[in-house]
Amino acid sequence: MNKALIITPTGRPIYHHEDYDKDNHWRFTKPERTYETCVVVYNDFQPEPGTYDYIIRRKGLKWNLAPEVSKIINWQDYDYIGVWDDDYATDIKSVNLALSYARRYDFRLFQQATTSFQTYDCLKHNPEFAFTETNFIELGVPFFRNDIYRKVLRFLDAYKYEASDWGIDKVLCFYLQASAHVVHDCTVRHML
């Protein structure tokens, strides 16, 4: 098991940004990826060909969809599971690099550093570091180690998520009893 899975509720065309290779958007299904992508289409949108390995059609909020999708996709076969919003830009090389750090240093949960203007200081890209340890990651583009994802699913089964502003990200590390990491050698950008 050395492949990750990104589950991404999707309802719009992919976003590109000049900082990333537009021919290698993170959702493109190219052979050099060390991950697969499952798009969960929440409206009538038809995802671009070659931008997903699996497609599921379901309506709902991302954190309510994650447990449903996890009953359909065999997530246990993956070493890391990401649950990403569809409005982020990065590329395959960046995601692969972040996953290589996670695998080498056994991260429990992590994300790539952000270059977005609206972000928390601890998540902002800092080229002085390869990665940093923190007690917080924003839940727009998180990755969870397989055993940690199991705990996230238990949390989501016990809590009925009803709004995007609840602040799960502020308590998740405490609940999981795990530190988080921000990989600064690669970045991601929130486009909205």
Give the ranges of each region predicted by the language model.
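Short beta-strand-to-loop acidic/aromatic patch adjacent to the donor-nucleotide binding site
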Residues: 77-89
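Conserved catalytic core of nucleotide-sugar-dependent glycosyltransferases
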Residues: 80, 91-174
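C-terminal catalytic/acceptor-binding lobe
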Residues: 2-16, 159-192
